[in-house]
Structure formats: C-alpha cells, structure tokens
Amino acid sequence: MNKARVKSMKKFWLVLSLAMFCLVVASLWEYSLNDWSVDKKLFLFQERLKFEEKRIDDQLRKLDHEAERQNPEWKGKQSVLVGFKGSKLVYWSNERIGSPRLYEILSAGNDLVKINNLYFDVRKHAVGDTVYYALLFIKEDYPYSSNYVKSHFNPSLGENLDDANKVIIRETWEAGGELVYNRDGRPLFKIESRVEHGDVVP
C-alpha cells in the first residue's frame, strides 16, 4: 500500500475516534446537566411551597387574636379558608371549592386533598371550638384540555407550564415521581414530570 494512503487512513481513524469521544463526552455532560436542572427545579418548587405554607401558617396563628370576630380576615388569592364547628360549616372565605363531603374530606387528616379537579395542601388550626382548614391551591387538573379549560399550577409555586398535563401529581404511596415534602417534613405528594426538552417544569 502507498505510504500516503496509509497516513491518510490513520488520520481518518484518529479524527473519527476523536469525534466519537467528543460526542460521548457531550452526551454525558448534557445528561448530567439535565439531571441537575430537574433536581434544582424540584428544590425551588419545594422551597416556594414551604414559603407559601409559612405565610398561611402565620395567617392561621393570627386567627387566635380574631376569635371574637364572626368573619376573620383571610388574605390570599391562591388559598381558601374554611371553618367548622363540629361538622357544621361556619366560615368560607370564597367559593372556589365546594363539595357535599367537604368536612369528611378535610377531617380525614390528610395533608393533600383533591376536591373536584383541584389539589390542595391542607393546613389545620383550631381556635376554641372552631377548626379552621387553610387550603393552599397546588394544581387544577382536568382530564381534558381546550382553549378555555387547561390544567395549571398555582403561579406562586413557580413558572407555569403551557401544558401542565405533562406534570403529574401522585399520592406518596404510588410508584414513580419525586417526593415533595411540606414544611413539617412530611411527604406531601409525588411529582412526575413528562416534560420534553425546552418545556418548563413548574
């Protein structure tokens, strides 16, 4: 064989080997960055959730000083306050939620409840013989979507998805997803992202 041809074949294989090595390193680098960004986004989501829980807990503690008032002041567009004496509803801050079994659902003691299509983080506080439940809105989840009705997350928990159907909330005992904890350290729910590259995680 010709020396020039052997030399050019060696260069060809060297360049091909270097290109393959660079592709492998680049794909490993992208994979590690992708994993890191999902972990970071989950961490930020959880921190925002804890911040909102603290804000709600502070408002609930203020109810101790407003016990004599019939209608306590409740601030927050992304939360609902309901109060029960026994099983009788005595206070309802807004009409965002409604269910004939509302007392049963809330008194079961779960930290996460789904009422109709809405997921809520439940914070409980008793003032005298009235038990208040503050419900922090997490996600509105529809089994379908249209131009008028779309699943969406609470905007105070982070950026919203164009299609929140790609992010699934699961019970803590279900398989799949990453655990999200409340500020008391208890598992609240699992979140599983089926978000493609370029979409935004909540």
Residue ranges and their predicted role:
Residues 1-202:
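N-terminal sensory and localization modules of signal-transduction and trafficking proteins
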